[in-house]
């Protein structure tokens, strides 16, 4: 069975650029620095519902 995936959205433009498997043990929202192809730079991406 495949794991449910959650989206990581850019905090600047709001685009959902990345999808990661959901971890039920993690209660806080995931925050990572990733490259946003729409902004053209590295920005903070946060887990969305």
Curated annotation (Swiss-Prot):
- Extract one GO cellular component term from the record: ribosome
Q: Name one GO molecular function term.
A: structural constituent of ribosome
By its UniProt entry, which Gene3D superfamilies does this protein fall under?
Ribosomal protein L33
Print the keywords alphabetically.
Ribonucleoprotein, Ribosomal protein
Database matches in InterPro entries: Ribosomal_bL33, Ribosomal_bL33_sf, Ribosomal_zn-bd
BP GO terms, sorted: translation
Q: Which family is this sequence assigned to?
A: Belongs to the bacterial ribosomal protein bL33 family.
| Database matches in HAMAP family | Ribosomal_bL33
Q: What is this protein called?
A: Large ribosomal subunit protein bL33B
Instruction: Name its species.
Output: Lacticaseibacillus paracasei (strain ATCC 334 / BCRC 17002 / CCUG 31169 / CIP 107868 / KCTC 3260 / NRRL B-441)
Lineage of the species this protein comes from: Bacteria, Bacillati, Bacillota, Bacilli, Lactobacillales
């Amino acid at each position: 069975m495949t794991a449910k995936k959650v989206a990581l959205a850019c905090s600047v433009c709001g685009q959902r650029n990345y999808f990661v498997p959901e971890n039920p043990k993690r209660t806080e929202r995931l925050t990572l620095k990733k490259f946003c192809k729409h902004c053209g730079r590295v920005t903070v991406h946060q887990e969305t519902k």
